[in-house]
Regions:
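N-terminal nucleotide-binding beta1-loop-alpha1 segment
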Residues: 1-13
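Short, glycine-/small-residue-rich phosphate/pyrophosphate-handling segment
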Residues: 136-157
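Short glycine-enriched, charge-decorated loop/helix-capping segments at active-site entrances
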Residues: 13-21, 64-65
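Conserved alpha/beta core of the MobA/IspD/sugar-nucleotide pyrophosphorylase nucleotidyltransferase superfamily
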Residues: 153-200
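A short, N-terminal amphipathic alpha-helix
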Residues: 25-43
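Acidic donor-binding segment of Leloir-type glycosyltransferases
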Residues: 42-63
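Short phosphate-binding loop-to-helix
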Residues: 57-91, 147-150
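Conserved donor-nucleotide/metal-binding helix-loop-beta segment in metal-dependent transferases, i.e.
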Residues: 100-125
Length: 200
């Protein structure tokens, strides 16, 4: 699931520190990195964009869809429901986790064979990956989206539903300037942001 790479639409918290142009450049690199990991994993991949515009044509390799729903939970649920019409299982990832790897995706795919739910927790209280074999609206009820309780709320729901759950290693997303500084070893971060700013 991703937003199209449009200036002013993506990484707004990061843009407050580095500017819209740098934030867009970093986001595009994150998007392309995420896509590359998905391709190398060998897992069939579709992209659900928050909206469609001419920029998504740059990613012709993937089947593209539009996200539908009033909040993030509904958009995730609807995307799962659509994919699981033709698949036995589905992994859903965002596009801002710089440490996402082929191994992580393949580990999640394998774990889902013997579980109901796979979650990759992020250190901000959310998750960078969720995997399901069945789309259940109850899993996404009463979740305070975009807060530090998303992971906890989801786990509470999973326990209540009796879902066998596997947790992947915790990773982090790039949402703001402090997150970006943690990933300065990545080429796109060093090239996209003024070195003086990175030293703050």
């Amino acid at each position: 699931m991703a937003k199209p790479p449009v200036m002013g639409l993506v990484k707004t918290r990061l843009a407050a520190s580095v500017g819209d142009e740098s934030a867009l450049r970093i986001y595009r690199e994150l998007l392309e990195f995420t896509f590359s990991q998905a391709v190398e994993s060998g897992i069939k991949t579709s992209v659900y964009f928050s909206e469609l515009d001419q920029f998504v044509d740059d990613f012709a390799l993937f089947e593209k869809h539009i996200q539908t729903g009033d909040d993030l939970g509904q958009r995730i649920l609807n995307s799962f429901s659509n994919e699981l019409q033709d698949a036995d299982a589905c992994l859903m990832i965002g596009a801002d986790c710089p440490d996402l790897s082929v191994d992580t995706l393949q580990q999640a795919e394998k774990a889902l064979e013997k579980s109901d739910l796979v979650l990759g927790p992020s250190d901000d209280g959310g998750y960078y990956l969720i995997g399901l074999k069945k789309s259940d609206p109850a899993l996404f009820k009463n979740v305070a989206w975009s807060t530090e309780t998303v992971m906890g709320n989801t786990m509470d729901n999973a326990i209540g539903l009796g879902m066998k759950t596997v947790l992947l290693p915790q990773l982090y997303d790039i949402d703001d300037f402090q997150d970006l500084k943690r990933s300065r070893f990545l080429a796109f971060a060093a090239e996209s942001v003024n070195n003086d700013l990175m030293n703050l």
